Amino acid sequence: MAAVSLSVSTVKPLGDRIFVKVAESEERTAGGILLPDNAREKPQVGEVTAVGPGKLTEDGKRQPMDVKVGDKVLYSKYAGTEVKLAGEDYVLLSEKDILAIVG
């Protein structure tokens, strides 16, 4: 089996899937207390790095995607598949898991 080199630029989502770079989690509380890695909340915000072509409708046409590369999005807390590439955290989501475009 040949080795596959994965990088952000080689990830091309299929259908209505979206590849999102996860935002950094807060390291300190509002009161200034430093949080260890295992006590931090899982972020639900990230930047879209790749977008699939859209879902096929029953008549064979592609439904356009509501998000584009560069959008900052809010997504469901337990949605998607987590991926780590080059030391960065990403999540692969379905479009239905995106709750809002922010900023």
From Swiss-Prot:
UniProt cross-references to SMART domains, sorted A to Z: Cpn10
InterPro entries: Chaperonin_GroES (IPR020818), Chaperonin_GroES_sf (IPR037124), Chaprnonin_Cpn10_CS (IPR018369), GroES-like_sf (IPR011032)
A Pfam family the protein falls into: Cpn10
Superkingdom field: Bacteria
Cell compartment(s), UniProt: Cytoplasm
Signal peptide limits: none
PROSITE patterns: CHAPERONINS_CPN10
SUPFAM superfamilies: GroES-like
NCBIfam families according to UniProt: PRK00364.1-2, PRK00364.1-6, PRK00364.2-2, PRK00364.2-4, PRK00364.2-5
Family the entry assigns: Belongs to the GroES chaperonin family.
Protein name per Swiss-Prot or TrEMBL: Co-chaperonin GroES
Originating organism: Thermosynechococcus vestitus (strain NIES-2133 / IAM M-273 / BP-1)
